[in-house]
């Protein structure tokens, strides 16, 4: 495809936008006393009350020990509680504390403000167009094995790729 627009420049702008967004989201997480990956855990446990660490790990496509570390940290901060499963004492069930609910709600609100700032000056039609452009680009980049994977699955795939690459070196 021949064009006067530099694809490289567009990709650089998309990458810059992604980095700026992540920095601003990270600032909001820290302001609310969370590490970056903790809000998705809190929100998952809120939606799936009394879930297991394994279920959270499966959803986020990370290892159970990785979730165990986060859960331990979140317990210590008073955000989550572990409750022994009465029907099977081998399992612990996770619940969000009142403090965790308040922080989750506040953090989500702050994250939404970052997103609102990002899209300020765009009308609804422009946002729909932008979403459509991104969907087309995503479709262009899909391969059979990645076609139906969710966000967390794609992150896990990326990690596997880089882990495999570093093992080869």
Regions found by a protein language model. Give the residues of each.
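C-terminal regulatory/oligomerization modules of transcriptional regulators
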Residues: 1-2, 125-169
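N-terminal leader segment of winged-helix/HTH proteins
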Residues: 1-32, 163-169
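Short, locally clustered residues in the helix-turn-helix/winged-helix DNA-binding domain
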Residues: 15, 43-47, 108
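N-terminal helix-turn-helix DNA-binding core of bacterial DNA-binding proteins
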Residues: 23-66
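Residues within the helices of the helix-turn-helix
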Residues: 54, 72, 92
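Charged, amphipathic alpha-helical coiled-coil/dimerization segments
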Residues: 75-135
């Amino acid at each position: 495809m021949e064009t006067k627009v530099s694809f490289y420049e567009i990709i650089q702008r998309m990458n810059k936008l992604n980095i700026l967004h992540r920095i601003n989201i990270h600032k909001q997480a820290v302001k609310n006393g969370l590490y970056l990956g903790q809000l998705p855990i809190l929100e998952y446990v809120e939606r799936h009350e009394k879930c297991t660490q394994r279920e959270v790990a499966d959803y986020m496509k990370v290892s159970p020990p990785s979730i165990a570390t986060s859960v331990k940290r979140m317990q210590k901060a008073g955000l989550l509680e572990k409750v022994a499963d009465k029907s099977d004492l081998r399992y612990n069930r996770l619940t969000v504390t009142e403090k965790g609910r308040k922080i989750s709600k506040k953090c989500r609100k702050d994250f939404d403000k970052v997103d609102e700032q990002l899209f300020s000056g765009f009308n609804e039609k422009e946002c729909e167009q932008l979403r459509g452009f991104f969907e087309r680009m995503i479709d262009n980049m899909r391969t059979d094995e990645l076609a139906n994977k969710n966000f967390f699955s794609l992150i896990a795939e990326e990690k596997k790729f880089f882990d495999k690459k570093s093992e080869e070196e």
